[in-house]
């Protein structure tokens, strides 16, 4: 014990020779303070890591809840047997950024997948933080027993009209949903199958995946069980999901986000190819088969890409249908335009006379994406391209006015940007 005390004394209190201590008495105190500060910060980081992990990463809770409902016959789905009976769905890295939306990387049928599951009800009570929760069956309460397939079809169509708008393409989407619900191909939709699909439709991202399933830049849906679903593996580029602790992500300044993206991101020509894919995704969101969609959180966190540097939207949670945004904003009480915001950056004007928000957005998707691309593309851009690219991006970011009234200008600016980038990387290995 005496030897241990002497060792601690030597490390903490005697870092310098006695002669040096005599000449610089203040250094010893500073050294001790620095060491203890390091110990404190390290302890805090360990505490944050484990507390945030236990709060944000509750895949085991999600699996217990889903499999409990499956064994009771309340829900079903194409991955239920593999998830709950055969244990063939492997949960790997936790990527969750909010307790209510569990996101994990995983492996299923020898494919890299992303596992997503909502457990809002399960997290409401703190009485059993580590035990399997008794989830109330609020999510799986519709449709009720006795509902006919015709009634379920009408119910689904009404839901889609409310969220996507009254579009002529919706009946075809309803047919696809019913086909997906009949995962065992027995030509009938059971109550458990209907409950599962209805619960999935309440998930914003799942509805977006269905609406954008034919688009190149959205992840493909692979299977589901209840309201848990699997998509293609998380694309490259979502580096902060693995590098940063989930609790620290919101604390990181946007400037540091951008710097890290440039340091750890791909070479400039690959970034140009990814940017072209992002611009194509903006086109896909504008007047598609199922209406217009708005990007309501435009950040580098969502700029994902495949192994061949083709753009993939990393997260569709903050992409919203026009009808949903309008319903939320129109008629909402406001004193100024800052009161009329959906998500993070979908803003509408405030009618100060009526003190109500209007339904049309001020800034289109393209203007927000171009703001993002200024930080993503200009650093490291070729000298001969830098000035023209900067000019095009500045023009793009100034797009304003009602999003529904700028279609022609929107398309022209977008086309010019894509052409400029393609010209730079065409006839090279990067194309």
From Swiss-Prot:
Entry keyword set: Disulfide bond, Endoplasmic reticulum, Membrane, Signal-anchor, Transmembrane, Transmembrane helix
Known tissue expression: Expressed in kidney, testis, lung, heart, stomach, intestine, pancreas, liver and salivary gland. Strongly expressed in acute pancreatitis, brain, and in peripheral endothelial cells.
Subcellular location: Endoplasmic reticulum membrane
Keyword Translocase: no
Cytoplasmic face of the membrane: 1-30
Transmembrane residue ranges: 31-51
Main location per the UniProt record: endoplasmic reticulum
Membrane topology label: Single-pass type II membrane protein
Motif interval(s): May mediate ER retention: 5-6
PTM description: Among the many cysteines in the lumenal domain, most are probably involved in disulfide bonds.
Family matches, as InterPro entries: FAM69_kinase_dom (IPR022049), FAM69_N (IPR029244)
Keyword presence, tRNA-binding: no
Disulfide feature: 57-94, 62-117
Membrane-side (Lumenal) residue stretches: 52-431
GO cellular component: a single term: endoplasmic reticulum membrane
Domain of life: Eukaryota
Protein family per UniProt: Belongs to the DIPK family.
Protein name, as recorded: Divergent protein kinase domain 1B
Provenance organism: Mus musculus
């Amino acid at each position: 014990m005496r030897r241990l005390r002497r060792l601690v004394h030597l490390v903490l209190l005697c870092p310098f020779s006695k002669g040096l201590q005599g000449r610089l008495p203040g250094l010893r105190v500073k050294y001790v303070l620095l060491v203890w500060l390091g110990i404190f910060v390290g302890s805090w980081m360990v505490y944050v890591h484990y507390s945030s992990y236990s709060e944000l990463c509750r895949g085991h809770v999600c699996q217990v809840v889903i499999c409990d409902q499956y064994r009771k016959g309340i829900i079903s789905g194409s991955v239920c047997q593999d998830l709950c009976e055969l244990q063939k769905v492997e949960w790997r890295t936790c990527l969750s950024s909010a307790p209510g939306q569990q996101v994990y990387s995983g492996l299923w049928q020898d494919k890299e997948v992303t596992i997503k599951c909502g457990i809002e009800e399960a997290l409401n009570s703190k009485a059993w933080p580590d035990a399997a929760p008794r989830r109330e069956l609020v999510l799986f309460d519709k449709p009720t027993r006795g509902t006919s397939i015709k009634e379920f079809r009408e119910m689904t169509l009404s839901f889609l009209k409310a969220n996507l708008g009254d579009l002529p393409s919706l009946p075809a989407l309803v047919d696809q949903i019913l086909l997906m619900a009949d995962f065992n191909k027995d030509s009938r939709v059971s109550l458990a199958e209907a409950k599962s699909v209805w619960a999935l439709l309440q998930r914003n991202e799942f509805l977006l995946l269905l609406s954008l399933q034919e688009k190149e830049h959205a992840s493909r849906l692979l299977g589901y069980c209840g309201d848990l679903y699997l998509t293609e593996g998380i694309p490259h580029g979502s580096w902060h999901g693995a590098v940063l602790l989930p609790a620290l992500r919101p604390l990181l300044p946007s400037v540091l986000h951008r710097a890290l993206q440039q340091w750890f991101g791909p070479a400039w020509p690959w970034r140009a190819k990814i940017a072209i894919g992002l611009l194509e995704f903006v086109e896909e969101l504008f007047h598609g088969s199922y209406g217009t969609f708005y990007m309501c959180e435009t950040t580098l966190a969502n700029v994902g890409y495949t192994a061949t540097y083709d753009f993939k939207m990393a997260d569709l949670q903050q992409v919203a249908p026009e009808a949903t945004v309008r319903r939320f904003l129109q008629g909402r009480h406001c004193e100024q335009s800052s009161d009329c915001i959906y998500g993070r950056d979908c803003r509408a004007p405030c009618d100060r006379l009526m003190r109500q928000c209007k339904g049309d957005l001020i800034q289109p998707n393209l203007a927000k994406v171009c703001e993002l691309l200024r930080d993503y593309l200009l650093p490291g851009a070729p000298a001969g391209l830098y000035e023209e690219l900067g000019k095009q991006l500045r023009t793009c970011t100034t797009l304003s006015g009602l999003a529904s009234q700028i279609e022609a200008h929107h398309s022209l600016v977008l086309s010019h940007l894509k052409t400029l980038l393609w010209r730079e990387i065409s006839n090279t290995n990067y194309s």
